[in-house]
């Protein structure tokens, strides 16, 4: 049974193995100007605040969300 299954699977996947995979033709150029230290710091601060501030607020007010029994 396993020999038959392996032959069947090999027959199904054999044709797929021979198909050429097209390469993506993506080209990009280097940035026109580098980001400065201040721009990087502002971006990282914004990401930190937008992700962790709401989570911290929810965790600090977790008791308010519990249903009274």
From Swiss-Prot:
User: From its record, what is one biological process in GO terms?
Assistant: mitochondrial electron transport, cytochrome c to oxygen
* Membrane topology value: Single-pass membrane protein
Q: Which UniProt keywords apply?
A: Membrane, Mitochondrion, Mitochondrion inner membrane, Transit peptide, Transmembrane, Transmembrane helix, Ubl conjugation
| Keyword Magnesium part of the UniProt annotation | no
Transmembrane region(s): 37-60
What assembly does the database describe for this protein? Component of the cytochrome c oxidase (complex IV, CIV), a multisubunit enzyme composed of 14 subunits. The complex is composed of a catalytic core of 3 subunits MT-CO1, MT-CO2 and MT-CO3, encoded in the mitochondrial DNA, and 11 supernumerary subunits COX4I, COX5A, COX5B, COX6A, COX6B, COX6C, COX7A, COX7B, COX7C, COX8 and NDUFA4, which are encoded in the nuclear genome.
The name this protein carries in UniProt is Cytochrome c oxidase subunit 8A, mitochondrial
Species of origin: Macaca fascicularis
The opening ranks of the lineage are: Eukaryota, Metazoa, Chordata, Craniata, Vertebrata
């Amino acid at each position: 049974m396993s020999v038959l299954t392996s032959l069947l699977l090999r027959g199904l996947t054999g044709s797929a193995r021979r198909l050429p995979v097209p390469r993506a033709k993506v080209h990009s150029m280097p940035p026109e100007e580098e980001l400065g230290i201040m721009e990087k710091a502002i971006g990282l601060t914004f990401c930190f605040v937008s992700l962790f501030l709401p989570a911290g607020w929810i965790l600090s007010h977790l008791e308010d969300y519990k249903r009274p029994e």
